[in-house]
A protein has these predicted regions:
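Active-site-proximal beta-strand/loop segments in catalytic clefts of secreted hydrolases
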Residues: 36, 46-51, 104-108, 143-147, ...
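Aromatic-rich peripheral "rim/lid" segments of glycoside hydrolase catalytic domains that contact
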Residues: 388-441
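Short catalytic/ligand-binding loop motif for oxyanion handling, primarily in non-cytosolic enzymes
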Residues: 55, 109-113, 148-157, 282-285, ...
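Aromatic- and acidic-residue-enriched segments that line the glycan-binding/catalytic groove
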Residues: 117, 147-241, 326, 415-419
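Aromatic-lined substrate-binding rim segments of carbohydrate-active enzymes
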Residues: 70-162, 230, 262-266, 289-305, ...
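Extracellular glycoside hydrolase catalytic/binding regions
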Residues: 82, 240-397
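N-terminal carbohydrate-binding accessory modules
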Residues: 17-100, 135, 139, 172, ...
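Cleavable N-terminal signal peptides of Sec/SRP-targeted secreted and luminal proteins
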Residues: 1-19
């Protein structure tokens, strides 16, 4: 009976992989290529990310997105932002000369319950967006977007149920920073702007404890998380969640399950060519993190064999690869996983640029050196700086700028609407500056 079950499971897995449609874009050595011709392609375009419920835009409307989130409307509380992504948006994106989007598929929104399934409403929206991009040949990175780890720690990305498993005794408690991170003043949460609004007031921190939208409802979170302070990511509750995710065990299994389900959902959508496993992961456990990337990549490949899958370092920074020149890119990564990277045919290195190193051209050189070391392409999947844009153009490096729209209507800039009943998305953790027509001439 056991052998029969094993055979049935194996057959089902093989059938799923065989049923997946070929991707629009694939990887060949250190390049992205068009699957139909094998021609190298540089992918460019915007981020399309919704950080709160319903976590994806609706495919509706007939005009392309234009945000109004300037200082004047913020002061008046009458800003406007987009809630849709439609044919007019695709046409506009193509008119700008772009050929891809980085689409947020936030774990907290895609899988709000600890179960072997994705949320039906999330799937409905996802399929509608990917049907649209399939019809138009617009390449899509599926970005497990998060900032400063988890809702339970005033960040976003990792779902509340996961934090409850990782650190149940810290849910709804004042945020604290443990060793060794508390020794670095700039990332100690007590030094984060807005922390003093609640400080150690346990009653205030306990409000909405355990709610999936804690990060948008609790006043202590709201006092700190409109910008994107690193102090939130290195708190004890968020580091417990990261450890639970990257170390071997049930937390890593949960993360891999999420990506297996996401890959299965995208199997019939050839435009969904890539999976970015986690936006800006906040952990110094590099070896365990790369082993987790490997486990997730293998699960994705079992569903969609030619889907490109990201590797990334802490915060997706462009600084760590300075190790390449002296130590090789695999420092702190197991020999087995380093070998797996070099022997792969579907991995790419995802990175961001927000001013480190100070010279964006040096950042690009760092990334190209890492790509050469591992024989993988690199992709700058987030940035705002025109210097980085132009450096990538000069080096034929793919990029996705932050961002097409804020895709949010929460907080005072939008009149303090009731979350989540009257709002869309989440205006937090670096939400402003949406620009559907960004240029860097």
């Amino acid at each position: 009976m056991y052998i029969l079950c094993a055979l049935l499971v194996g057959t089902a897995t093989t059938a799923t992989a065989a049923a997946a449609q070929p991707r629009l874009v694939k990887i060949q050595d250190q390049n992205f290529v068009l699957a139909t011709t094998g021609e190298s392609v540089v992918l460019t375009g915007p981020n399309v990310v919704v950080k709160g419920p319903p976590y994806l835009p609706e495919v509706s409307g007939s005009t392309f997105c234009v945000d109004h989130t300037d200082d004047e409307c913020k002061a008046a509380g009458n800003c406007t932002s987009c809630t849709s992504f439609n044919q007019a948006d695709v046409d506009h994106i193509k008119s700008m000369g772009w050929n891809q989007i980085r689409l947020g598929v936030v774990w907290a929104g895609a899988q709000p319950r600890d179960e072997d399934a994705l949320d039906p409403e999330f799937l409905r929206r996802l399929h509608e967006v990917l049907d649209l991009t399939d019809r138009n040949g617009l390449a899509v990175i599926l970005d497990n977007h998060g900032d400063m780890v988890a809702s339970a720690g005033c960040g976003n990305g990792v779902p509340m149920w996961f934090s409850k498993k990782a650190a149940p005794e810290l849910i709804g408690k004042p945020l604290t920073t443990g060793l060794p991170y508390k020794l670095v003043p700039s990332i100690n949460v007590k030094n984060t702007e807005g922390y003093d609004h609640c400080g150690s007031d346990e009653a205030k921190w306990a409000a909405f404890a355990g709610d999936p939208n804690y990060n948008l409802l609790n006043e202590c979170c709201l006092a700190m998380n409109s910008p994107n302070p690193a102090g939130l990511g290195w708190t004890e509750i968020n580091q417990r969640a990261m450890d639970f995710m990257v170390l071997p065990g049930p937390g890593r299994d949960d993360f891999v399950r999420f990506w297996r389900l996401m890959a299965a959902a995208a199997a019939d959508h050839p435009s969904a060519f890539a999976a970015e496993l986690m936006n800006e992961p906040m952990t110094i456990r590099r070896g365990a993190m790369f082993d987790t990337w490997r486990a997730a990549a293998e699960a994705i490949s079992a569903e969609v064999p030619d889907m490109s899958v990201s590797l990334s370092d802490v915060g997706e920074g462009a600084v760590l690869p300075e190790w390449v020149g002296e130590h090789d890119a695999g420092v702190f990564i197991s020999t087995s996983t380093t070998r797996w990277i070099r022997e792969s045919s579907n991995l790419f290195y995802a990175w961001h640029y927000y001013g480190q190193p100070s010279d964006p051209q040096q950042a690009v050189r760092n990334m190209l050196a890492l790509g050469e070391s591992w024989n993988v392409p690199t992709f700058m999947t987030e940035f705002m700086d025109c210097g980085a844009w132009n450096a990538c153009v000069a080096a034929n490096v793919s990029f996705s700028y932050w961002h097409y729209s804020a895709y949010c209507t929460t907080g005072p800039a939008f009149g303090d609407l009731v979350v989540p009943d009257e709002t869309f998305g989440g205006c937090m953790l670096g939400w402003g500056g949406g620009d559907s027509s960004k240029t860097c001439a």
